Structure formats: structure tokens, C-alpha cells
């Protein structure tokens, strides 16, 4: 029986477009000069309050690194946590554009108490109660981590990528990894392979080998669970297009905003912790001091939830 997964449906749609001489939105490329001024709004704000202020179909990508029910949070029990998560998941689905995606970071509570909330709980809920598609489960594999004596030392974290519809945006070319020269030369001689695809590089797969930030990392701004910019960059480049809006309502360290500025996207970043504003400003300083931003790229920083609309005015549906 033929595999009728949404992945194959997407390939068939892409091939049909190419035969007719058309291009899918994920094949378009915009230079920095075409993006114009991007806008970046931030505030200290609860996730549900943030989402309530946003219109339907208004953002392209949501980066989501939620707190988990691991005895460190203020939920009374597992059902309280899941009930809370269901509310922001439903709102996230509402605000995503038809081509949009949400990338949810999380871990598995291997030896936690029965019923502890983790990414499995969220995936299970989404598969049973949402129309969104589980496009990929990404394994972030890192070499550095805690040692262990009673179990195999953990060296990975999961990222669940859900797409709102089968029309989701995905720009593989933006995140391809180059082949080494020896492999590239061998592949170019293989008549079964497309030379253009070989030239572009390999699909990075859903296993991403990237180090976590250590205590001495220059990226660190003080947040205890800060994610490396490289991980966020790959998500932003692959799942959003230049000029679109990236939302992060558990923004923590503020790294999503920094990456959005670098990549020519608009952003809305909020967090319930008052210290978030301090982290956000550190990210901006890091960006400017280290020359990570294209000098030709223009961006504006706006504080306050009342200004969310400023980051949405460019629109988000790739066409």
C-alpha cells in the first residue's frame, strides 16, 4: 500500500508546482535589502495574556520552551499542569497562520513520579485533541551533560514540531549542511543523484548534534535553561520566512528575539518573570557588541504588550 503521509503529499505538491513552472513559498529567497525594518516587541506578560492579545492566523512560527511539572513549579498536581498546558496549546493553534508551525522543547521525566507532566503528555494531548500535524520529533543530541551511575547518562532533548496544516512552510535549503569535499566529489559522479541537490548540501535530519551552553559560554545571559542560538536559528530559518513573525511566550533568556533580528524576522517575546527584561537587554547588547547583525538590516525594539500589532503588520502568510 502506498504511504499517504503528509510528507509524501507535500512532495507530490512540490513536484506538481515545479512541472508547471511555479515555485512554492518555501523556495523563495529574500535578501536583507528586501525585508525592510523588522519590529521586535517584548514585555513581562503571562503566556495566556500574551496569546489573548493576538488575532487569529497572525504568526508564522512559535518557539515554545515551557516549564515542566517537575516539582519546581506551583501546580498542585499533574491534571492542573495539563489543564494549563491545554489552554495555551489551543490558543497557540488559533494564532498560527495556515502555513505556521510550533516547535515545543521538552524532556521526558524518566524517573519522576507517576503522572508527572512532560513532553509525552503534551504530544499525547495534541495527537488526540488537535488537528495539528506532528511533522517531526527532533532529537537535540548534545555531547555535554550530567554523569550517571544508575542509568544511561542522558545526552538529548526532544523538540516536537507541529504544523497547523498540510500547507506548512518548510525551507530545507536554508538549513542544509554542506558535504565534505571528498563526499561531494563522489556524489557528483553518481548519475543517480541530482548535482544541484548535492551542491546545496545534505538534509540535517531530525537528529541535531549541537552542544548545550556550558557555564563559561559567551552566549549566557544568566537564565538557567538558556538554549543555544544555533538550535533556535535552525528552527527559525527552516520554519519561517523573512519578514514573518516569530512568537515566544516562554521567552526566558530572550535568545529567540536575538535570532529573529539576525534572520530578518519580526518577533513578539514575553515571559512571566520580571527578570526577563534584563535578559532581553543583554541579548541586544550581545548582538550589537559582537557584530552579529547585518549592518544593512534595520530593526526596531518596542516594549509593551499594547504594541504587539507592530510586529504583525507585515503579514505572515507566505504566498
From Swiss-Prot:
Q: Any idea which UniProt keywords this protein has?
A: DNA-binding, Methyltransferase, Restriction system, S-adenosyl-L-methionine, Transferase
How would the record characterize activity across temperature?
Optimum temperature is 37 degrees Celsius. It has about 60% activity at 30 degrees Celsius, the optimal growth temperature for this bacteria.
Q: How is its activity regulated?
A: Strongly inhibited by N-ethylmaleimide, inactivated by MgCl(2) or MgSO(4).
Reactions performed catalytically: a 2'-deoxyadenosine in DNA + S-adenosyl-L-methionine = an N(6)-methyl-2'-deoxyadenosine in DNA + S-adenosyl-L-homocysteine + H(+)
Task: Provide the GO MF annotations for this entry.
Answer: DNA binding; N-methyltransferase activity; site-specific DNA-methyltransferase (adenine-specific) activity
Question: Where along the chain is composition biased (Basic residues)?
Answer: 1-10
Enumerate the residue ranges of region (Disordered): 1-32
Q: Which InterPro entries match?
A: DNA_methylase_N4/N6 (IPR002941), DNA_methylase_N6_adenine_CS (IPR002052), N4/N6-MTase_EcoPI_Mod-like (IPR002295), SAM-dependent_MTases_sf (IPR029063)
A biological process (GO) annotation for this entry? methylation
Reported EC number(s) for this entry are 2.1.1.72
Activity sensitivity to pH: Optimum pH is 7.5.
- Family indicated by similarity: Belongs to the N(4)/N(6)-methyltransferase family.
Q: What is this protein called?
A: Type II methyltransferase M.RsrI
Amino acid at each position: 500500500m502506498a504511504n499517504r503521509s503528509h510528507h509524501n503529499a507535500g512532495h507530490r505538491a512540490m513536484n506538481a508546482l515545479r512541472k508547471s513552472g511555479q515555485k512554492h513559498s518555501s523556495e523563495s529567497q529574500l535578501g536583507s535589502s528586501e525585508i525592510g525594518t523588522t519590529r521586535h516587541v517584548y514585555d513581562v506578560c503571562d503566556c495566556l495574556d500574551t496569546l489573548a492579545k493576538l488575532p487569529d492566523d497572525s504568526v508564522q512560527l512559535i518557539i515554545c520552551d515551557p516549564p515542566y511539572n517537575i516539582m519546581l513549579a506551583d501546580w498542585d498536581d499533574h491534571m492542573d499542569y495539563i489543564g494549563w498546558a491545554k489552554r495555551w496549546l489551543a490558543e497557540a493553534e488559533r494564532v498560527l497562520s495556515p502555513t505556521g508551525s510550533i516547535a515545543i522543547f521538552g524532556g521526558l521525566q524518566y524517573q519522576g513520579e507517576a503522572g508527572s507532566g512532560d513532553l509525552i503528555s503534551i504530544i499525547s494531548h495534541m495527537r488526540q485533541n488537535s488537528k495539528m500535524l506532528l511533522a517531526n520529533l527532533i532529537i537535540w543530541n548534545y555531547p555535554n551533560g550530567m554523569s550517571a551511575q544508575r542509568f544511561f547518562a542522558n545526552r538529548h532533548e526532544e523538540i516536537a514540531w507541529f504544523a497547523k496544516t498540510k500547507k506548512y512552510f518548510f525551507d530545507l535549503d536554508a538549513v542544509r549542511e554542506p558535504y565534505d569535499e571528498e563526499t561531494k566529489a563522489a556524489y557528483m559522479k553518481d548519475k543517480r543523484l541530482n548535482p544541484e541537490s548535492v551542491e546545496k548540501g545534505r538534509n540535517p535530519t531530525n537528529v541535531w548534534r549541537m552542544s548545550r551552553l556550558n557555564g563559561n559560554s559567551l552566549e549566557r545571559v544568566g537564565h538557567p535553561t538558556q538554549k543555544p542560538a544555533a538550535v533556535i536559528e535552525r528552527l527559525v530559518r527552516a520554519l519561517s520566512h523573512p519578514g514573518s513573525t516569530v512568537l515566544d511566550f516562554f521567552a526566558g533568556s530572550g535568545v529567540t528575539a536575538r535570532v529573529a533580528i539576525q534572520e530578518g524576522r519580526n518577533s513578539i517575546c514575553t515571559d512571566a518573570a520580571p527578570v526577563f527584561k534584563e535578559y532581553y537587554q543583554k541579548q541586544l547588547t550581545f548582538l550589537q557588541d559582537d557584530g552579529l547583525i547585518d549592518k544593512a538590516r534595520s530593526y526596531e525594539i518596542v516594549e509593551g504588550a499594547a504594541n504587539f500589532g507592530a510586529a504583525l503588520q507585515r503579514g505572515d502568510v507566505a504566498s
